[in-house]
């Protein structure tokens, strides 16, 4: 099976794509590798870690847009200081990279969905996905399993949304799991940061 994954902002953070369904992971992987798809990367297609790092560094040369707290006359203190220290700290985007990549098992039958997965906040799934799929909350049963690490990543509901779409499309039980490459490419990253710290000593 080749199943289209449609864009659902609340469930997939605006993503869409194609799911390959087979009777084994190896077969599905080989079938996916054989697909020739041209993706439109959109306005962020040229953005990279390097280009974003340069943008952050450039922002530090501009006047601040927000000052959280300011006491005394910092400019005068720095001018009269006998010694000065200044350094930059950069923190890159970080993926959760859980030991167990994102996955979810789902069934669909007669308007009822059932999920199995290591969900950190199952209430998010119960509160959000029934409405998106046009069913009542009681038509979705969630079974919690052990998880190989979470770190906040399994608070997202994108894997559950994908599994529900595929299960309904093929009307068979389906186990959705991402490769490590999928996991890294589609994670909700910890934000990158760039800081400049200056200190004066007397």
Cite the ranges covered by each PLM segment.
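Structural alpha/beta core scaffold segments of enzyme domains
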Residues: 1-202
